[in-house]
Structure formats: C-alpha cells, structure tokens
C-alpha cells in the first residue's frame, strides 16, 4: 500500500485565499475578516445616531424635542426609543409599521432599533477584531476577553432589559440626558443602588480606577534612569531587553505601606484585568435580573417600624420614600399615553420630604 503525503493542490484563483490575502494584508488600518462585521455596523450605528440627534424629533414617541433642529444641544439631544405601543417590533424600514416610508420610520422610532442592533454587532465585531489581530501576531486573547465586559453591559441594558419589559420604550434612549433619566428610572422603579450586583459593579469600576492610578504612579516612581532623553518617552529604546522599572523597589515600597504587595507582574496585571471585567459582568447580570423584575434588598422591618413610629427614620426608609416620589412623578411624565393621575393621598409623605 502506498501512502501519499502532502497538501492537496488548490486552484490558483481560489476566492477564499484571495479574500483572505486582501483582508489580512498589512496596512495602516487593519481590516480582517472581523472588519466585514465591524466597519459596516459601526458606520451605520454612528451614522444613525448622528442623523437622529440632528434631525429626528421624539414628539411622536415621547412627546419630547430631541434634535439639534428643534433646539437641543449635545447634552440634551438623543435618538429616543420607539413608542410603548410598538412593543418589541424590530421596526424594519420595510415592515408593516413604516411600510417603506423613511420619514414615518424615523417618527416611529425606527432609528433606535437601527442604532441599537448595529451598535451591538459593531461591538461584537470589535471584539472579534482583537481576537483576529491577537492570533495574527501570536498574542494571548485577553484584550478580547476583557472587552466582553462592555459588550455584556451594552447588551443587557439596551437589549435584554427592554425585552423583559413591555417594549423597547423602556430601554435607554441614545443621549446624555436620556441616559441620566434612565438611571433615575432604574433607581425609582428598581431601587438599583441597593442591588448587590450594582454594588459589585461599582466596586469593580472604582476599584479598577484606583488600581490603575496606583499602578501608573508606582511605575513612574520606580523608572530606571538609564536614558539621557528629556522625558520618559525618549529615554528608552522600545526594543530594550532590560525592564523599564524596578518591580523589587515597588514591592518593597508597598510592603511597607500596606504590609502586603504584589510580588509577581503576571498576578498584578491579571488582577487589574479581573477587577473591572468582573464588575462589569456583575452589573450586566444584575440588569438581566431587573429585566425579570427581581427585587433588590428589602429591609421590611425598618419600613414597618418607620410607618408605625414617626420618630424612627433611617437613610433606607428615606430612600424608599424618595423612590416612591420618583415613581409617582416619572410614571405620569414618562408614560403620557397611560393617562395616569395620582391623587394627593397616594403621593409619598415623610418626615423629610
């Protein structure tokens, strides 16, 4: 029996090889296979956002002005969510709602679903871009893995949360003031600040900022003076074999400050990766819980005692009253189509309100 070893010869003009060669060619801006997803989706998402904030009103969906054309500025303009009556419709331009009419599509809030979906796929494309480039230059894929944190937060807040509610209407609109309003909504209707997943998210993000500041300052403090350049950036050769700063000195310094310190660069930098990414993922999990209307911590005993004893009040009971006030005001303001009217006797009252 004869065994032939070797590769099966391919056709000279193989389409896949031709595309692979062009897409992954070394150029100023790398394209890659991931670019087929990233660049079109990012272009449409940003283009839709700029179009919406410049020209498109929210009068038909929220009863608001939301564009530069109507007098808004960068902080108050937004691409707002579709009307509550449209539920979870994808609002395709050629769908039954707009029927190919671009103006009507914009009035109904079609730009929001357009920006949200293209934005989500653009973020996924950017993550794949990091995987692809890491594989090309033989790096580990931790950059891409880290970027899963922001993707998880975006998908949970803009897509999963409104899918768990009655419609896209309850997602955040794409604008600065609109996001602030959404944060107030989360607090009033879900008591988000007392949610343990939010607490873990805050600990992760602020802890990462602290770690970043400490790490940057420590490296600057322990740089070796082995260059004669005028500043840090010109004093070192990017191909030098020696380390740029003294890990031993840094370890000794923080050992004296705290009693403990990182003694290993790998563990130090993995910890700096782990803290923010875990925080973002915990926040995303918490928002998925809110989509299902899971509650935060409830200290019912304090609420009962506060109701029975006018002299007893805690920061928790004050916040619960404040949340009731947010709901009573925001529900009527935010959902005018419901024609909500709250009589005086149901509005929250407290010792300090």
From Swiss-Prot:
Q: Which Gene3D superfamilies match?
A: Photosystem II protein D1-like
Family assignment from sequence similarity: Belongs to the reaction center PufL/M/PsbA/D family.
Q: What is its EC number?
A: 1.10.3.9
Q: Which UniProt keywords apply?
A: Acetylation, Chlorophyll, Chloroplast, Chromophore, Electron transport, Iron, Magnesium, Membrane, Metal-binding, Oxidoreductase, Phosphoprotein, Photosynthesis, Photosystem II, Plastid, Thylakoid, Transmembrane, Transmembrane helix, Transport
Where, in this chain's numbering, is chlorophyll a PD2 bound? 198
Higher taxonomy:
Eukaryota, Viridiplantae, Streptophyta, Embryophyta, Tracheophyta
Supply the name of the protein: Photosystem II D2 protein
- Quaternary structure note: PSII is composed of 1 copy each of membrane proteins PsbA, PsbB, PsbC, PsbD, PsbE, PsbF, PsbH, PsbI, PsbJ, PsbK, PsbL, PsbM, PsbT, PsbX, PsbY, PsbZ, Psb30/Ycf12, at least 3 peripheral proteins of the oxygen-evolving complex and a large number of cofactors. It forms dimeric complexes.
């Amino acid at each position: 029996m004869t065994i032939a070893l070797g590769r099966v010869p391919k056709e000279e003009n193989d389409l896949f090889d031709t595309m692979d060669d062009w897409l992954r060619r070394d150029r100023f801006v790398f394209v890659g296979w991931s670019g087929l997803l990233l660049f079109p989706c990012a272009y449409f998402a940003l283009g839709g956002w700029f179009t919406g904030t410049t020209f498109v009103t929210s009068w038909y969906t929220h009863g608001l002005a939301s564009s530069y054309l109507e007098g808004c500025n960068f902080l108050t303009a937004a691409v707002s969510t579709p009307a509550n009556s449209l539920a979870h419709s994808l609002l395709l331009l050629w769908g039954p709602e707009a029927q190919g009419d671009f103006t009507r599509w914009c009035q109904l809030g079609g730009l929001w679903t357009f920006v949200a979906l293209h934005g989500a796929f653009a973020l996924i494309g950017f993550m794949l871009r990091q995987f692809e480039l890491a594989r090309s230059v033989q790096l580990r894929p931790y950059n891409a893995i880290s970027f899963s944190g922001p993707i998880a937060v975006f998908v949970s807040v803009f897509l999963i949360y409104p899918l768990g509610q009655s419609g896209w209407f309850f997602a955040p609109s794409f604008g600065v003031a609109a996001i602030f309003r959404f944060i107030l909504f989360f607090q009033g209707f879900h008591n988000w600040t007392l949610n343990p997943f939010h607490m873990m998210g805050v600990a992760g993000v602020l802890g990462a900022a602290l770690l970043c500041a400490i790490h940057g300052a420590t490296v600057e403090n322990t740089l070796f003076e082995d260059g004669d350049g005028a500043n840090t950036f010109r004093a070192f050769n990017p191909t030098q074999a020696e380390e740029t700063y003294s890990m031993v000195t840094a370890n000794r310094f923080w050992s004296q400050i705290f009693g403990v310190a990182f003694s290993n660069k790998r563990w130090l930098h993995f910890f700096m990766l782990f803290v923010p990414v875990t925080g973002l993922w915990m926040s995303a999990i918490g928002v998925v819980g809110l989509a299902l209307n899971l509650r935060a911590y409830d200290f019912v005993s304090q609420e009962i005692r506060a109701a029975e004893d006018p002299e007893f009040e805690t920061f928790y009971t004050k916040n619960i009253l404040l949340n009731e006030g947010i709901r009573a005001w925001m529900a009527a303001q935010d959902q005018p189509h419901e024609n909500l009217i709250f009589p005086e006797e149901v509005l929250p009252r407290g010792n300090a309100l």
